[in-house]
Amino acid sequence: MIKAVVFDLDNTLYSYDANHAYGMEALEGYCRETFGITEEETQEYYRKAGYIMANRIGTDTAAIHSRMLRLQCMMELLEKPLFPHVQKMYHIYWDAFLQHIEPNPGVLDFLMELRKRKIRIGIGTDMTAYIQYKKLEAIGAEVYIDFMVTSEEAGVEKPHYHLFELCVEKAGVRAEECVFIGDNVKKDIEGAWESGLRGIWYTQEKEPTERRYFPTLRSFTEINVDDFLTQQ
């Protein structure tokens, strides 16, 4: 019997890809007006900044997702002053991102039904904590969340077992009583199963492109909650 359901956040409860595009569009506008560079040049500097970050801090850390650090690296590449641009660009990106964010179809109804059945609901996510809280508030999911585990708190990124251990610890149940739903096969699903949780691959409204030996979920609108809780 399932007693807790833990969700990845980005590209699971909402579309990260769509909202990142809005954030980048706003960032490109600022760079065009302020530095006189094209959208393509902004994107290239943004990519190069990501490579620099990976070399400096590694990839198994929440800091790799920090937009503040990414934009700081961009200013270093452009040889522009850090102040006031880094903070301005940070807020421009995230304001545009959050302005357009919406939950994926069926997500809030599913969370509500889990809450009615007294199922513990958590988030297990690779990212810094503050912005993940903002995203959950923006999609209206915050009222359903019992616990959070970010890679910033865990000190490691998925699929490291420690992040999943923290999810189970905070859920207050056994690992086998805990489902983990996410969009990334390696990080979310294989990581969950290898840590003793039941991983379910959310395929983002698409049919799986390859055969997998674990459960899949195409859409949150298709879930019969009682069957879901007893059949997993």
Whereabouts are the PLM-identified features?
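N-terminal helical cap/lid subdomain that shapes the substrate entry/recognition surface
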Residues: 2-105
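Short glycine/proline-enriched coil/turn segments at helix->beta-strand junctions
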Residues: 76-79, 117, 212-213
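Asp-based, Mg2+/Mn2+-dependent phosphohydrolase catalytic module
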Residues: 1-5, 18, 33, 40, ...
